[in-house]
């Protein structure tokens, strides 16, 4: 587990530690080496010391989860792949397929020779490819919720235009010193941010287009006064009139056999998905005919760490739900 001292890395380490079929061989940190993980995160109860990642001491390692910041992950991912190690990357370094789009939003890529080689890790959409993958790009939290909310419509080529208002807790900022997420700034408060453009928008557009609906997306994220949880509200204009009953039937059929995506009879809430790998979806049609689709997830679970383990299970030929129920 590379980068185990951040929120998503620490949680991934805890899930692997408790996993019935995996052994956590090492947990590394660039900033907290020498400290114990169970001292940094007592509630995860992972009694292991954090060390510096030594790429020359990886004998017997089958897989790695990398939880470094965007831009910093790619060189480490490349080094691990050179050694034949399966990699689940939690950063954005391998999510986008177009190099110009990546450069616009993230800058120069740290491993251009690997760009475009990762399988996008939205498990419910790419399950077959993930079973054969050697490098998985775990989706961003906002794209996870938003694309799952819209996928049944996108797969039918129904989306014409999409507006998304998404809200999440402060853990989405990571272990940030930004005073925006200090308790005194966030308590009894909520606000939009990056209103003129967020880097998850092109990721959402990429995946909707790949499913069959190259629709323009307007995306505005909001910050909520809670630590974990994310709610995505998606307003979709369809290319042709479709009844509410037909749309709900489409969602029920698409997700009926999914172990972690549940289609609800009413709007979802964040408390129900906290500390789970679940995504709760609800879809309806408002009076003017526009579809409104909702998805609730825990942003550091299904939006990052547990989805990474869900994909790792598939890569290793394990039960997809192992360690996650």
Where do the model's predicted regions map?
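A generic structural signal for well-ordered coil/turn residues at beta-strand boundaries
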Residues: 132, 228-230, 275-277
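C-terminal substrate-binding/catalytic lobe of Rossmann-fold NAD(P)-dependent dehydrogenases
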Residues: 196-263
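Short beta-strand or tight-loop elements
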Residues: 118, 215, 277-279
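Alpha-helical scaffold segments in soluble metabolic enzymes
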Residues: 11, 15, 148, 152, ...
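N-terminal Rossmann-like NAD(P) cofactor-binding subdomain of oxidoreductases
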Residues: 1-188, 193-195, 285-287, 322-324
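A general secondary-structure junction signal
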Residues: 166-168, 221, 265
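Conserved active-site and cofactor/substrate-binding residues in soluble primary-metabolism enzymes
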Residues: 7, 117, 141-148, 195-203, ...
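C-terminal active-site/capping subdomain that shapes the small-molecule cofactor and substrate pocket
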Residues: 235-325
């Amino acid at each position: 587990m590379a980068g185990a001292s951040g929120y998503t890395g620490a949680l991934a380490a805890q899930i692997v530690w408790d996993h019935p079929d995996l052994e956590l061989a090492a947990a590394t940190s660039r900033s907290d080496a020498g400290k114990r993980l169970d001292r940094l995160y007592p509630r995860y109860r992972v009694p292991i010391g954090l060390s510096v990642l030594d790429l020359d001491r990886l004998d017997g390692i089958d897989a790695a989860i990398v939880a470094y910041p965007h831009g910093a992950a790619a060189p480490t991912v490349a080094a691990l792949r050179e050694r034949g190690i399966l990699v689940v990357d939690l950063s954005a370094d391998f999510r986008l397929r177009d190099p110009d789009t990546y450069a616009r939003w993230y800058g120069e890529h740290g491993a251009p020779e690997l760009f475009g080689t990762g399988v996008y890790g939205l498990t419910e959409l790419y399950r077959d490819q993930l079973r054969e993958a050697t490098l998985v790009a775990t989706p961003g939290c906002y794209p996870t919720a938003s694309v799952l909310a819209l996928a049944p419509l996108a797969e039918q080529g129904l989306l014409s235009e999409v507006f998304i208002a998404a809200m999440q807790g402060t853990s989405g900022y990571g272990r940030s010193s930004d005073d925006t997420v200090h308790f005194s700034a966030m308590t009894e408060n909520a606000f939009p941010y990056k209103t003129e453009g967020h880097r998850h928008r092109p990721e959402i557009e990429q995946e909707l287009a790949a499913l069959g609906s190259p629709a323009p997306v307007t995306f505005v994220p909001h910050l909520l006064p809670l630590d974990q949880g994310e709610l995505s509200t998606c307003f979709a204009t369809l290319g042709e009139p479709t009844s509410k009953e037909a749309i709900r039937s489409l969602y029920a059929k698409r997700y009926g056999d999914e172990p972690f995506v549940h289609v609800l009879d009413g709007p979802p809430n964040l408390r129900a998905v906290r500390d789970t790998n679940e995504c709760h979806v609800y879809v309806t049609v408002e009076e003017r005919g526009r579809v409104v689709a909702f998805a609730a997830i825990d942003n550091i679970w299904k939006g990052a760490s547990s989805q990474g383990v869900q994909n790792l299970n598939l890569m290793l030929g394990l039960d997809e739900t192992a360690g996650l129920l």
